[in-house]
């Protein structure tokens, strides 16, 4: 049985016994009933006492909390009100005591005839020289600054001939604090003034200086030379180790990138995510790229690449290495580069030749995003534009594996609006995808002059947003290869016109389109090319 039930049963039993004892006549004098009545009174008295104790304990707690809150409020008010008021009351006296000498000094600057100098008893009584009294230093020169020459003071002519007070010159003198600071007051050095060399030096300075503030070219010549030397000096950004071998039978140049050492840190964690791009100059038709190595400054690659180069062209070819730092959500940072020329010298080695080269810092390099090859074909009678995406080469690596998952998206733009979009399939883990896929748009013949097409190469990501690798544009309102390709298509209807296009960055295209539209280029109404952001896919 629960506690509440037992209490209720006890109350009922007590009420019943009370009724039996005092309701029936003759039981008032019964000893048992009288004893029971005393027990009831004691029980009620105990209950009242417990109630009083609980009430008194609660009042004590409330009183204590009130006292604590009162003390905290008094302490806070003392901190906020009393201390600032006390400091405010004491500040005027401190300011008067601290700044009185300076105020006295500035007060007398406008009245130079009333300038007084305090004296110090240091043995025999000697006149104390004021730091504003130039006549006390008849043979010394005025020092305007650390770089300006010393100007001797002419006591005879002085400032009387020019009607200029001495105080104007004195304000420019690099002087120490006033005369009240006895120990810090500079004194003329007798040895320097009395030495025979001092007079000759002063005469030379008088001949060299013709006016105050004259610039000495020799002071800045050395700095300019150092600056030019720093500009021409290239910073070493580590070293790279690779092997070369030329096979005469197949006319192939075999390059094996072994490792790199002491690369600079490009990330906030003190490391880099390096990879190497390699290609032959000057055409750059074929480019290779190593895998990305995470969080290291001494990557080990051990990757081999082959270039088909005839033997008679080795002398005019150069091998170009570019070391990059991989960034997932921004442009890759160029760490440095190495150019190996005169490859004919290394063709004499039939076996692998290990070569070490210093990686030199490169200030900037044009973004190499790759190229795309597609054809345009328009049928005027059907009003149909067919864009055949053939392939892309040398795309930028967007994944840590050193590859990308590219697909191509074509957007049809007219009057600042995207009308339609088409896209190809996704090619996994490649930088040279081959598509051969046709993207068809229905465009009336009269609207061909008002449309543009954006070709964007995207990198597909399973998790997150797809990113733009690079893009190009074709249409009547474009410039360069895009406009030439479009005009050639219109001049040759029902015939596919194939052409290669260089991919550019999204921000570069947007800035160029903004400038061209502001200048009003193009024969037709300017059409804003809206490049679809990867966040909208």
UniProtKB/Swiss-Prot annotation:
Protein name in UniProt: Synaptotagmin-C
Pfam families reported for this sequence: C2
Region Disordered, annotated ranges:
92-111, 142-200
Q: Which domain of life is it from?
A: Eukaryota
Can you say where in the cell this protein is located? Cytoplasmic vesicle, Secretory vesicle, Synaptic vesicle membrane; Synapse
Vesicular side residue ranges read: 1-52
Bias (Basic residues) ranges: 100-110
Keyword Transferase belongs to the record: no
Source organism per entry reads Diplobatis ommata
Q: Where is this region: Phospholipid binding?
A: 228-477
Record-listed Ca(2+) 2 binding positions: 267, 325, 327, 333
Question: Can you name one GO molecular function term for this protein?
Answer: SNARE binding
Q: Which family does it belong to?
A: Belongs to the synaptotagmin family.
Question: Which cysteine pairs are joined by S-S bonds?
Answer: none
| Positions of the C2 domain | 236-357, 368-501
Instruction: Specify the protein's topology with respect to the membrane.
Output: Single-pass membrane protein
Q: Name one GO biological process term.
A: calcium-ion regulated exocytosis
An annotated GO cellular component of this protein is: synaptic vesicle membrane
PROSITE patterns the record matches: C2
Its cofactor is: Ca(2+)
The chain's coiled-coil residues are none
Q: Lineage of the source organism?
A: Eukaryota, Metazoa, Chordata, Craniata, Vertebrata
Q: How is the cofactor bound?
A: Binds 3 Ca(2+) ions per subunit. The ions are bound to the C2 domains.
User: SUPFAM superfamilies per the record?
Assistant: C2 domain (Calcium/lipid-binding domain, CaLB) (SSF49562)
Q: Where is the composition biased (Polar residues)?
A: 143-174
- Cytoplasmic side stretches: 79-537
Task: Give UniProt keywords alphabetically.
Answer: Calcium, Cytoplasmic vesicle, Membrane, Metal-binding, Repeat, Synapse, Transmembrane, Transmembrane helix
């Amino acid at each position: 049985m629960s506690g509440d039930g037992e209490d209720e049963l006890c109350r009922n039993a007590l009420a019943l016994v009370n009724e039996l004892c005092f309701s029936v006549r003759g039981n008032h004098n019964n000893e048992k009933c009288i004893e029971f009545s005393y027990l009831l009174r004691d029980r009620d008295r105990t209950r009242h006492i417990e109630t009083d104790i609980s009430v008194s304990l609660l009042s004590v707690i409330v009183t204590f909390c009130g006292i604590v809150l009162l003390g905290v409020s008094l302490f806070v008010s003392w901190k906020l009100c009393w201390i600032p008021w006390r400091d405010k009351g004491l500040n005027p006296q401190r300011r008067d005591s601290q700044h009185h000498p300076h105020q006295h000094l500035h007060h007398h600057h406008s009245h130079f005839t009333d300038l007084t100098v305090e004296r110090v008893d240091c043995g025999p009584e000697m006149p104390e020289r004021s730091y504003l009294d130039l006549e006390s230093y008849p043979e010394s020169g005025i020092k305007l600054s650390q770089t300006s020459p010393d100007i001797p003071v002419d006591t005879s002519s002085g400032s009387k001939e020019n009607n200029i007070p001495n105080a104007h010159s004195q304000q420019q003198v690099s002087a120490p604090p006033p005369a009240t600071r006895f120990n810090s007051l500079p004194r003329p050095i007798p040895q320097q003034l009395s030495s025979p060399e001092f007079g000759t030096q002063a005469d030379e300075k008088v001949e060299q200086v013709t006016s105050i503030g004259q610039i000495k070219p020799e002071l800045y010549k050395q700095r300019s030379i150092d600056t030019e030397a720093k500009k021409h000096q290239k910073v070493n950004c580590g070293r790279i180790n690779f092997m070369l071998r030329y096979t005469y039978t197949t006319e192939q140049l075999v390059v094996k990138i072994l490792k790199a050492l002491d690369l600079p840190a490009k990330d906030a964690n003190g490391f880099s995510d390096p990879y190497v791009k390699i290609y032959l100059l000057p055409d750059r038709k074929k480019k290779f790229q190593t895998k990305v190595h995470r969080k290291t400054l001494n990557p080990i690659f051990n990757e081999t690449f082959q270039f088909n180069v005839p033997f008679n062209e080795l002398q005019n070819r150069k091998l170009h290495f570019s070391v990059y730092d991989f960034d997932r959500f921004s442009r890759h940072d160029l760490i440095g580069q190495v150019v190996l020329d005169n490859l004919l010298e290394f063709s004499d080695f039939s076996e692998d030749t290990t070569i070490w080269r210093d990686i030199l810092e490169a200030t900037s390099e044009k973004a190499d995003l790759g190229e795309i090859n597609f054809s345009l074909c328009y049928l005027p009678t059907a009003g149909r534009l067919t864009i055949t995406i053939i392939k892309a080469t040398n795309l930028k690596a967007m994944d840590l594996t050193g590859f990308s998952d590219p697909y191509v998206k074509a957007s049809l733009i007219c009057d600042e609006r995207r009308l339609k979009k088409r896209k190809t399939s996704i090619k996994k883990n490649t930088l040279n995808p081959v598509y051969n896929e046709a993207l068809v748009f229905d465009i009336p013949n009269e609207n061909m002059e008002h449309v543009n097409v954006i070709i964007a190469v995207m990198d597909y990501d399973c998790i997150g947003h797809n990113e733009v690798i690079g893009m190009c544009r074709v249409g009547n309102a474009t410039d360069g290869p895009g406009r030439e390709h479009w005009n050639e298509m219109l001049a040759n209807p029902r015939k596919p016109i194939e052409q290669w296009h260089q991919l550019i960055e999204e921000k570069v295209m947007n800035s160029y389109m903004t400038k061209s539209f502001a200048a009003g280029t193009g024969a037709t109404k300017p059409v804003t090319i809206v490049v679809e952001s990867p966040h909208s896919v």
